[in-house]
Amino acid sequence: MQYLVLLSSGFLYFISLICGNGIGFWLCLEMATLLSVCGFFVPGISFNRYNPLMCFIILSGVSSILLFLGVNNDIFQLFIFLSFLIKLGIFPFMGWVLLVYTNVSWLLLFLLGVVSKVTTLYIPLSGLVGSEVSLGLTLSGLNLVVASLMFWKSINGIKGFVAVSGLGTSSLLLAVSMETTFYSLLILLVCYFISSGVNFLVFHYLENVSISSSVNGLLFFILLAIPTSLSFIYKLISVFIIMSLPLSFICMWVLFSISEQLFLCMLIVEKSCVTIKVI
């Protein structure tokens, strides 16, 4: 039953894009958010669920109010931009992402961290891009820099890596949605969904099963941006899409990508070493 509820929540994120008006978009997001709350109560799994749940409800409520005001009156269009900053975890609203993402099940993490990002398509569809472009690029760039540092200072474990990696993706999607075309954003999202779907399956396996040297190389190939791997194809497509963005943003994205790959490599090696010691 719980899986059906979360599946319905994910479906509503996609439906929100074809509602035809701002109120329909807001209503679908509200329903998706309410349904996703069920994912915090996973039987048989012990999480520190109440602090993340309260944080999620409060931030979702604030974001919802801002979005509702923005879609109802053009004067408050800036509020839509602020709502997306909160939902995507863009600087300075990064903290809730770490708190929530590291204390939920993998299914809910995929829903909140990957599927919900489809809502960024609303930005070019609704023509929201305006005076907020420079501010959006600046905050996205800062988000990438801070996330790069967080890899080495603020995270622990696989879910922590996924959370910070998601912050970088949010920055990329926001910048692309404001500076490029709808189709560029759509292509990037499709590649991201495919790559993340495979990676999430591997991360779930990596967290729950001790790996041996025989599968260590396979994990490196799947997760790292090695030529012909899914991650490499996703990164390569990202490079082509962001070429029209300011050079400063591209440099910050490169910094983030290098930090991400180095930390991921260290994570796999560390997991392998732990397995060897146990054996």
Model-inferred region functions:
Residues 1-279:
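Core, highly hydrophobic multi-pass alpha-helical transmembrane subunits of bioenergetic inner membranes
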